[in-house]
Amino acid sequence: MSIPILNYSLSTQNQRVNGFEGLPGDELPKIYTTDNLPTSIEMDEIIWAAYRQIFSEHQMLSSCMDRFLESQLRFNQIKVKDFIKGLVLSSAFRNLNYDCNNNYRFVEMCIQRVLGRDIYNEREKLAFAIIIASQGIETFVDFLLNSDEYIENFGDNTVPYQRRRIIAQRSKGEIPFNLKTPRLDYNFLYKKNMPQLLWSGPVRQFRPQEQKPKAGDPALFLNMVLDVSPSYLISS
């Protein structure tokens, strides 16, 4: 029997407030959608925007590209929503984001990249982490893509984006999610970059050349005495 999702309260975020701008300005993000029968060049931009949204700029590697999904999207065999699902469930996304993090971190990253908003609170993070632990990643991804929030904001043909990151009449907007939530948490980053001692021989003390004792230095006589009669010095 699966555990039902926990209830959690919502918090105030910019994306929950409708904008009152008369005309779209620079504060509104560019919308990448297939509703208007895009050309070949526009389809390339849509695919690139999907990769950038899901994998972020620092994960856009050639190994992350799925040419089969791209071909299906170009020939209208799948929707943008299906393309997003294929990227999130791909082995590349799993290796780069899930295998090196815990469920809480993975939930936060998926909500930011799929729903285009930040998590409401720790209760929401815990609720979705339980779904991953009890029902798996695919059920969690289906829950996000089939939610009313995703359908109302992006539908089947629009690439997700960070909603209302920039608001009119403000000096600066919110931090982009790829900078706010990097791929690795500090705990995993510390473990990953911990130096390991691979030298199996004895560890010798290193003394720089300029600090070595010269002729006439009392330290040389002390070493000579230790070499001649160490037992006498220890007993005394």
Curated annotation (Swiss-Prot):
Domain (PBS-linker) ranges: 11-193
Gene Ontology annotations of biological process type: photosynthesis
Principal localisation: plastid
InterPro entries linked: PBS_linker_dom (IPR001297), PBS_linker_sf (IPR038255), Phycobilisome (IPR016470)
Role: Rod-core linker protein required for attachment of phycocyanin to allophycocyanin in cores of phycobilisomes. Linker polypeptides determine the state of aggregation and the location of the disk-shaped phycobiliprotein units within the phycobilisome and modulate their spectroscopic properties in order to mediate a directed and optimal energy transfer.
Subunit structure: The phycobilisome is a hemidiscoidal structure that is composed of two distinct substructures: a core complex and a number of rods radiating from the core.
Protein name: Phycobilisome rod-core linker polypeptide cpcG
Organism for this UniProt entry: Aglaothamnion neglectum (Red alga)
Annotated gene: cpcG
